[in-house]
From Swiss-Prot:
Gene Ontology annotations of biological process type: rRNA base methylation
NCBIfam families on file: rumA
Basic and acidic residues bias locations: 472-483
Gene Ontology MF annotations: 4 iron, 4 sulfur cluster binding; metal ion binding; rRNA (uridine-C5-)-methyltransferase activity
Protein name (database record): Uncharacterized RNA methyltransferase GSU1452
Biased composition (Basic residues): 484-495
Enzyme class per UniProt: transferase
InterPro entries in alphabetical order: MeTrfase_TrmA_AS (IPR030390), MeTrfase_TrmA_CS (IPR030391), NA-bd_OB-fold (IPR012340), SAM-dependent_MTases_sf (IPR029063), TRAM_dom (IPR002792), U5_MeTrfase_fam (IPR010280)
Record lineage: Bacteria, Pseudomonadati, Thermodesulfobacteriota, Desulfuromonadia, Geobacterales
Catalytic residues of the enzyme: 424 (nucleophile)
Binding locations of S-adenosyl-L-methionine: 299, 328, 349, 397
Length: 495
């Protein structure tokens, strides 16, 4: 992006703006995707590559009735938050980390501001304290896994991600967010594709073999797993590629061929073939060991995950006498972290494979007071209550869409003294906290955690306590929750 102003540029004006036009505007905020927000002729414009307190020249990429979208081509007046030299030479062209051009303290401030803006939309949450964002232990090289597209030809292979608004694959080379071992694996695989003449899959023609590369690493052991996703078995080509990879990077201890012949953008298929004797990695967080298989879910930022788990344990205030339910428990991370200070922990998860991993992790750590069950969260928590189980603490860790109202009603009906809610989406977190307020639970504080530096994503932990009982407290249906306050047209908040 050029920072010099060109006096010869003709700028668009008036309501007849069209795609490709150049406009000048002042940027006042960031949206939830990390794009700048400004106005042009009274219409909101979302500008890729722009920061608050900047004036930019931008090219319109989409013209809608209510919003315009643009890409900054020139920063006329830079923000104090803008870095003079970003950590990645692809900044501005890669969608992976739009905030890499911003000073890290400003990223943390924006994430708190964005979280607080979502929380304050609800009158019931006015007393909740939104704390300063906890930083990631590592701002770069924190990702312990990568899912990458393989493109090009065996003579000139490309491994990376799709360019913005395109099916063209951008070679990521050495990514500053990836653990250095991941970057070494990617480099070795590119060399191996050429050396072993591995045919690269072409989605237009349906020809070729290798579609994706998935890399996972264990920070504890310094070892790696490589998963080659192919359209068919073809053992010969992948066997030679695996041999080259392990010779080039001896830290690769697990190599898997996954066969995915389906169309579409789903990465992993249903069939795995292990090309090594070892089938999994082992990671450790806070003294708890986890088995990482090709399909296991594991947080991509190990240091950030440790902060979340430790905060949940601290806010739970367990004494060893409590019964805990961990809803949406995944592979059992939080449940196993809490087991040492609880009487018993029940993990509930809808994905059966994740429950199998959780049970395996409990055995690995010789933890005997954790049980895990696969099924519907609302139904299983109701069964626990009907069986006479007293629930002292409920931990919620749902996907981005948040919790169903039925789940929240069942949780409130169980009457735990405390609820700790872990969320990856501030908007749905605020919505669910408002529902729980109507069901008798007050949100005391919300803790943003930066799990994904250089990106707009933010995790949050909320602590809720049961209010003093009122006759009508738990009779309020979820649908009667307070309506959010009128929100600004532009999403997000200023840095």
């Amino acid at each position: 992006m050029n920072k010099k102003r060109s006096p010869k540029t003709v700028l668009a004006a008036g309501p007849s703006s069209k795609r490709g036009d150049l406009i000048e505007l002042a940027v006042t905020a960031l949206d939830e995707d990390g794009n700048g927000i400004g106005t042009h002729d009274g219409t909101n414009v979302h500008v890729i590559g722009a920061l608050p307190d900047e004036r930019v020249r931008a090219r319109l990429t989409h013209v809608g009735k209510r919003h315009l979208h643009a890409e900054a081509v020139e920063v006329l007046t830079p923000s104090r938050a803008r870095l003079a030299q970003p950590s990645c030479k692809r900044a501005g062209s890669c969608d992976g980390c739009p905030l890499i051009v911003m000073h890290y303290p400003d990223q943390l401030n924006w994430k708190r501001t964005f979280t607080e803006r979502q929380i304050r939309r609800y009158q019931t949450l006015g007393a909740a304290e939104v704390l300063a964002t906890l930083p990631s232990p590592n701002q770069l090289h924190y990702r312990n896994s990568a899912k990458l597209v393989v493109s090009g030809t065996f003579r000139r292979p490309v491994i990376g991600i799709y360019r913005r608004n395109s099916h063209q694959v951008m070679d990521i080379g050495t990514c500053p967010l990836h653990h250095p071992l991941i970057n070494r694996v990617v480099t070795a695989v590119k060399e191996g594709i050429a050396k072993c003449k591995v045919q690269v899959y072409n989605p237009r023609t349906g020809s070729g073999l290798l579609r994706y590369l998935v890399v996972r690493i264990s920070e504890r052991t310094g070892t790696a797993m490589a998963v080659f996703v192919t359209v068919e078995r073809n053992y010969n080509e992948i066997h030679h590629l695996a041999k080259h990879l392990q010779q080039s990077v001896p830290q690769v201890e697990v190599v898997v061929q996954n066969v995915n012949s389906s169309e579409g953008n789903v990465i992993l298929g249903q069939r795995d073939y292990f090309l090594t004797r070892q089938h999994a990695l082992t990671e450790e967080l806070g003294g708890i060991r986890f088995t990482i298989s090709p399909r296991s879910f594991f947080q991509v930022n190990s240091g950030g995950a440790r902060i979340i788990y430790e905060t949940v344990r601290q806010w739970s205030s367990l004494t060893g006498k409590e019964s805990v339910v961990d809803l949406y428990c995944g592979i059992g991370g939080i449940a196993l972290f809490l087991a040492g200070t609880a009487r018993e922990v029940h993990g509930i998860e809808v994905v059966e494979a994740a429950v199998n991993d959780a049970e395996s992790n409990a055995r690995l750590n010789r933890i005997h007071n954790c049980s895990f069950e696969a099924g519907d969260a609302a139904e299983l928590i109701e069964e626990l209550v009907e069986e006479g189980e007293r629930l002292d603490l409920v931990v919620l860790n749902p996907p981005r869409k948040g919790c169903d109202a039925g789940v929240l009603n069942k949780v409130a009906a169980a009457g735990p003294a405390r609820i700790v809610y872990v969320s990856c989406a501030p908007a749905t977190l605020a919505r669910d906290l408002d529902i729980l307020a109507g069901l008798g639970y007050a949100t005391l504080r919300v803790q943003p955690v930066d799990m994904f530096p250089q990106t707009p994503h933010v995790e949050n932990i909320a602590l809720l306590v049961k209010k003093l009982p009122r006759n009508d407290r738990l009779e309020s249906p979820a649908k009667e929750r307070s309506r959010p306050r009128a929100s600004h047209k532009a999403k997000g908040g200023a840095v």
